[in-house]
């Protein structure tokens, strides 16, 4: 089986794209099938190579790999062949209305309470009328086979049916000779043997038309799944909505697996759960769990998931990334992973555990810190050093609770709050602990 993800390279990947790509990928991998990446770049004015590169980079970052890829712009000759075949068969016809004339017709139909379906007037033009339009380049429509009930079994929505009388003949080629989405898409699906098409519910009416096109070309009909659209604050998500691109999510410090864990489950009957490997998402994937109801997207939910993903990642998962902080110790990661919201927070903890941290010692605490220095147990700092140290200190001071712990934390970390010092001390090490506690002496 083969699925495909077909973004238009007219902008960056937004969250709606990510969800579709991920679901297509998971479906293919679950079935041991293939995942095809197709760039719908027939809009030559808006499509850009830089967006193709960025989309590829974003998918790689998200751990979504593809088995093959191509651009529709490389297949125009093939589209022309099929176009000419359908034209010869009388299934495509030229039209000459301007945009203004089409808009006028649409408004008049709506005013009369009629559906704004194209009236097929171009099919009834006399030769004399066609001659009048000789200076106008035509655009072309596909001729829908009317009086037909178009049905398919959607894996998300169940049985879906359209009466072809309620469908307007779609424009498939523009005045400038470029193609719209409709025809190239089904030619590619046919030629590349795409067996399963998963996309947003905004394509449902397109599916009805494309099924007729596939019948006209005597091609197999793929299995369709139409996902509910993502909404955020009651607005449909699109690439034009700010703050919802992969680039934005990267800037928030989100982990790829936090994003994948979230989008693999929202809009399904299953709760969102933490996964650090794509194989876990593959094992739990089931297209039939997706709901038809609108799916609410909330970036705050992904942000809350991010620390849980980090906490679940092993040292081997992050070993290479830690090298940029000169960290090679598994014990450091095992301690820090439960105390960070995003990976870049590592920098702060690396400074705390290195010699770059400047202690914070108040004037009223200098004598107490010197006492604490003298009470520090001898030898290597271990997991039990903190408890032994505090026990020694308490025997020589009346300080208790925060009056005892806060000055020590400030001197050792520069912070008034944080994780257990008992676990942190071995990472700092005896030499550095002594340096920090001695800081008041050199002021």
Swiss-Prot record:
Keywords: Aminoacyl-tRNA synthetase, ATP-binding, Cytoplasm, Ligase, Nucleotide-binding, Protein biosynthesis
Subcellular location: Cytoplasm
Top EC category: ligase
Classification via PROSITE patterns: AA_TRNA_LIGASE_I
Reactions mediated catalytically: tRNA(Glu) + L-glutamate + ATP = L-glutamyl-tRNA(Glu) + AMP + diphosphate
Chief location bin: cytoplasm
Binding site for ATP: 239
Ranges spanned by the short sequence motif 'HIGH' region, renumbered to the chain: 7-17
Covalent S-S links between cysteines: none
UniProt cross-references to Gene3D superfamilies, sorted A to Z: 1.10.10.350, HUPs (3.40.50.620)
Any Gene Ontology CC annotation: cytoplasm
Alphabetical GO biological process terms: glutamyl-tRNA aminoacylation
The protein's Enzyme Commission number: 6.1.1.17
InterPro entries, sorted: aa-tRNA-synth_I_cd-bd (IPR045462), aa-tRNA-synth_I_codon-bd_sub2 (IPR020751), aa-tRNA-synth_I_CS (IPR001412), aa_tRNA-synth_I_cd-bd_sf (IPR008925), Glu-tRNA-ligase_bac/mito (IPR004527), Glu/Gln-tRNA-synth (IPR000924), Glu/Gln-tRNA-synth_Ib_cat-dom (IPR020058), GluQ/Sye (IPR049940)
Motif 'KMSKS' region location, chain numbering: 236-240
MF terms (GO), sorted A to Z: ATP binding; glutamate-tRNA ligase activity; tRNA binding
Function: Catalyzes the attachment of glutamate to tRNA(Glu) in a two-step reaction: glutamate is first activated by ATP to form Glu-AMP and then transferred to the acceptor end of tRNA(Glu).
Family: Belongs to the class-I aminoacyl-tRNA synthetase family. Glutamate--tRNA ligase type 1 subfamily.
Subunit structure: Monomer.
PANTHER family attached to this UniProt entry: GLUTAMATE--TRNA LIGASE, GLUTAMATE--TRNA LIGASE, MITOCHONDRIAL-RELATED
Protein name: Glutamate--tRNA ligase 1
Taxonomic placement: Bacteria, Pseudomonadati, Pseudomonadota, Alphaproteobacteria, Rickettsiales
């Amino acid at each position: 089986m083969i699925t495909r993800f077909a973004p238009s390279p007219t902008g960056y990947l937004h969250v709606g794209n990510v969800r579709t790509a991920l679901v297509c990928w998971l479906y293919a991998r679950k079935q041991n099938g293939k995942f095809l990446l197709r760039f719908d770049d027939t809009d030559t004015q808006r499509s850009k190579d830089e967006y193709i590169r960025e989309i590829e980079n974003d998918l790689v970052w998200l751990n979504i790999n593809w088995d093959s890829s191509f651009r529709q712009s490389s297949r125009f000759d093939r589209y022309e062949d099929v176009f000419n075949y359908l034209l010869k068969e009388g299934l495509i016809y030229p039209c000459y209305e301007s945009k203004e004339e089409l808009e006028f017709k649409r408004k008049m139909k709506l005013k009369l309470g009629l559906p704004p379906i194209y009236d097929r007037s171009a099919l009834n033009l006399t030769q004399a009328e066609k001659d009048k339009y000789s200076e106008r380049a035509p655009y072309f429509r596909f001729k829908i086979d009317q009086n037909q009930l178009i049905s398919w079994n959607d894996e998300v929505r169940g049985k879906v049916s359209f009466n072809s009388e309620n469908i307007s003949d779609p424009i498939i080629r523009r005045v400038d000779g470029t193609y719209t989405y409709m025809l190239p898409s089904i030619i590619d699906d046919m030629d590349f043997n795409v067996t399963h098409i998963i996309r947003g519910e905004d394509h449902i009416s397109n599916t009805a038309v494309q099924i007729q096109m596939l019948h006209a070309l005597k091609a197999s009909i793929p299995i369709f799944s139409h996902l509910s659209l993502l909404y955020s604050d009651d607005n449909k998500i699109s690439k034009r909505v700010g703050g919802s691109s992969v680039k934005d999510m990267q800037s928030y410090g989100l982990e790829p697996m936090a994003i994948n864990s979230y989008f693999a489950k929202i809009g399904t009957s299953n709760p969102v759960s933490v996964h650090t490997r794509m194989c876990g998402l593959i094992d739990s994937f089931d297209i039939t769990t997706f709901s038809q109801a609108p799916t609410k997207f909330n970036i705050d939910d992904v942000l809350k998931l991010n620390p849980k993903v980090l906490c679940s990642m092993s040292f081997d998962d992050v070993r290479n990334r830690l090298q940029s902080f000169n960290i090679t110790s598994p014990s450091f990661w095992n301690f820090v992973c439960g105390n960070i919201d995003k990976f870049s927070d590592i920098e702060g903890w690396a400074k705390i555990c290195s010699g770059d941290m400047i202690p914070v010692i108040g004037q009223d605490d200098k004598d107490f810190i010197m006492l604490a220095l003298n009470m520090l147990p001898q030898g290597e700092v271990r997991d039990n050093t903190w408890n032994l140290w505090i026990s020694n200190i308490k025997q020589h001071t009346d300080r208790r609770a925060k009056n005892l712990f806060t000055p020590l934390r400030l001197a050792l970390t520069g912070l008034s709050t944080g994780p257990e010092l008992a676990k942190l001390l071995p990472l700092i090490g005896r030499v550095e602990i002594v340096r920090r506690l001695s800081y008041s002496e050199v002021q």
